[in-house]
Amino acid sequence: MSKQLTAQAPVDPIVLGKMGSSYGIRGWLRVFSSTEDAESIFDYQPWFIQKAGQWQQVQLESWKHHNQDMIIKLKGVDDRDAANLLTNCEIVVDSSQLPQLEEGDYYWKDLMGCQVVTTEGYDLGKVVDMMETGSNDVLVIKANLKDAFGIKERLVPFLDGQVIKKVDLTTRSIEVDWDPGF
């Protein structure tokens, strides 16, 4: 299999998807995309995977839709056994490949780890995850151990201007208009 061990590992790696189970006998794999538009995962190259603690670059040879899935063919992956070795590998790219966003737009990866504080100064905790609900994104905030309200996790809608008052990526903080009791 033609995977390249690379000294040029992604500087700021970001996971864009995951390889699923093999498909057929010629080395095809199902692929699951985390990008907003599933097909956008193919716009970002090269892809990296991590096997046994080593970064490896893989080259996309082809992709296509198959029923509800997308399947991929990687260069050098020519049979089912080789494809099975890549099942569950995360597809990683360097975040420098992502397009620049307009003012007030943020990548979820940039919000992770930010401290969330109410407009009154109450520390709600840190962003540990994000959820897409259809109507708006939601911050998943892990509360501080000694939270005065006994809350372990908070879900705060990412509604710019209404709930989210200020995002400062330099200080890694988000100011929200939110009742800490929720």
From Swiss-Prot:
Q: What does this protein do?
A: One of at least 4 proteins (Era, RbfA, RimM and RsgA/YjeQ) that assist in the late assembly stage of the 30S ribosomal subunit. An accessory protein needed during the final step in assembly of the 30S ribosomal subunit, for assembly of the head region (the 16S rRNA 3' domain). It may act while Era is associated and before RimP in 30S subunit assembly. Essential for efficient processing of 16S rRNA; a deletion mutant accumulates 17S rRNA. Deletions do not assemble the head-associated ribosomal proteins correctly. May be needed both before and after RbfA during the maturation of 16S rRNA.
Q: Which organism is it from?
A: Escherichia coli (strain K12)
| This protein's name | Ribosome maturation factor RimM
Q: Which family does it belong to?
A: Belongs to the RimM family.
GO CC aspect terms: cytosol; ribosome
Organism domain of life = Bacteria
Compartmental location: Cytoplasm
GO BP annotation list:
maturation of SSU-rRNA; ribosomal small subunit assembly
Which effects follow disruption of this gene? Disruption causes slow growth, incomplete processing of 17S rRNA, accumulation of 30S and 50S subunits and decreased translational efficiency. Altered levels of ribosomal proteins in 30S subunits; uS2, uS3, uS14 and bS21 are severely depleted, uS5, uS7 and uS11 are decreased, distortion of rRNA helix 44 near the decoding center. Slightly different results show ribosomal proteins uS2 and bS21 are not found in 30S subunits, decreased uS3, uS13 and uS14 in 30S subunits.
